[in-house]
Amino acid sequence: MNRLQEKYKSDIVKAMMDKFNYDSVMQVPKIEKIVINMGVGDAVSNSKALDMAVEELTILSGQKPLVTKAKKSIAGFKLREGMPIGAKVTLRGERMYDFLDKLVTVSLPRVRDFRGVSKKAFDGRGNYTLGVKEQLIFPEIDYDKVSKVRGMDIVVVTTANTDEEARELLTLLGMPFQK
């Protein structure tokens, strides 16, 4: 079992039950999944760009990403319906906790001028979205092999009903929010 998973079961559940006065342990919010999405706009003209993005996401997450395709044709972007334009990966269970642990303890502190992640990026239903400007903050990505600096979206989906519950859960898990 992962370090964060143990911390959740031993400490966080008790702390959340005390703070929000839940009747049952099953009411305590937990992390359901983490979705990492990488949009690759250059994939329209350069198919190698998408291959690199898929490779990087595989290294980061430990599983093969799903290639996302365009839903509509947009002439201004020279985009046809069904063209591959990105990659996403959904993490659950053990890999999800491993990734969150790595993100919070290793990767986010490596961001230049890092003062914490925004408190306003909750969606009203207890999910948190985080944008990363470059994939180089992750230690597994080799700087020399990177052809282009790409960002990604990381969505943490929780079972929390309110943003306040989700914020408390992520804070207890170690997410460095801005003061």
Swiss-Prot record:
PROSITE patterns: RIBOSOMAL_L5. One of its GO terms (cellular component) is ribonucleoprotein complex. Signal peptide: none annotated. It comes from the Bacteria. GO terms for biological process: translation. The keyword Ribosomal protein applies. GO terms for molecular function: rRNA binding; structural constituent of ribosome; tRNA binding. Disulfide bonds: none annotated. Pfam families: Ribosomal_L5, Ribosomal_L5_C. The keyword Transferase does not apply. Keywords: Ribonucleoprotein, Ribosomal protein, RNA-binding, rRNA-binding, tRNA-binding. Part of the 50S ribosomal subunit; part of the 5S rRNA/L5/L18/L25 subcomplex. Contacts the 5S rRNA and the P site tRNA. Forms a bridge to the 30S subunit in the 70S ribosome. NCBIfam families: PRK00010.1. Belongs to the universal ribosomal protein uL5 family. This is one of the proteins that bind and probably mediate the attachment of the 5S RNA into the large ribosomal subunit, where it forms part of the central protuberance. In the 70S ribosome it contacts protein S13 of the 30S subunit (bridge B1b), connecting the 2 subunits; this bridge is implicated in subunit movement. Contacts the P site tRNA; the 5S rRNA and some of its associated proteins might help stabilize positioning of ribosome-bound tRNAs. This is Large ribosomal subunit protein uL5.
